[in-house]
């Protein structure tokens, strides 16, 4: 296709060459350039794509999209843009024929609840007869195709490629998780979401490799409400007024607040042997009783979010309730049967907010003991380690501190940081570096009435050590332990 058609919704300056140039494909990885490619020079945190200009020209690139002037032969067209990541989103959308305009698009952001809510929405809409694509932390789902995820929110080119494949597969709509990094790096530019959902916000993802401070984190998250037609926001969030500041969408709210458009009232814990759940009554825009077999107040918020979205798709009460019963997410309060005496679950809680919410919720079910096993990721904020240690020390009867993804740090050094937070409490703890050994300890020392939580890994099926990912699925580890391996 001609370059001019790829640039039709973008501000740019043509430094040399012709915008009538034919483009074979759009590339942002210099290793994939071929004859006739358009190459986008991305200025990354580690590598600057501009330095690969001589290489991609040698491979046959005919168009360069740049943020600064570069030297290139006369037969190479050079397009100057203010931000090449932003430009890539619009170029990619044009390249794939603006597929988002053929779908109902639902974007969900927030510190927690994104993953569970996306699967709830998918379950409800599919139960009502819609064909739904999904993009998220765990995977992308396009028809019968499942693609393991590398990032919560992929690069803009990949998003548009997925959208295109969803249209080809006959999807009506797509629900996707939208990370603060994805918003900050313009991965979701090039289209406007039909629905943008903001679940909550608490300090997280703050550090040298992520956001400089909470204000930056909040600012990036709230960009979604400037990139959607209808915004659906948690009215109970303490930062609500800042979240909606400058929004350009029509706004709806949900929560327990009397001011919320969709409200939960009369919440109750429900449970039995191997079953932990919650029920509530829905009021406001809809009026019916809801029961979910996922414990905790956050399950109410997740289901409220999903219901608030699906209301716009005219889904019946019957379909909503039926779908919520079967909506399950790998690694999100995932019950694993190991004994009739105690309950064991796997959960992705990997920051203090999520861990506190999870443990506080489970405390409400009055276990004999609440046992929390977790570690923290290497090459990430130390503050997270202190905070998680303190949270577990306060809320768990026993904490088993172990390894998560140590990456390039020594596992014991990470554990030592966690114990700094533990020391602020009277909580009992043991240190077991090897995660399989730690899980075995938890199972073999389980007592009747215990609730045991394996926190942090969730859906992940690997452990990252010194730059390499080794296979490690907690479900497999548990099966091996029970088999005596």
Regions found by a protein language model. Name each.
Residues 44-45, 70, 180-181, 202-205, ...:
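Short glycine-rich anion-binding loops that position phosphate/pyrophosphate groups of nucleotides
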Residues 62-68, 231-235, 373-374, 397-405:
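Short internal beta-strands
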Residues 1-90, 94, 226, 238, ...:
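N-terminal leader/targeting and accessory segments in enzymes
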Residues 1-14, 35-38, 248, 285, ...:
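ATP-dependent carboxylate-amine ligase
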Residues 7-9, 70-75, 169, 184, ...:
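Acidic, Mg2+-coordinating active-site environments of NTP-dependent enzymes
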Residues 7-10, 88-231, 235, 239-247, ...:
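Phosphate-binding loop of NTP-binding sites
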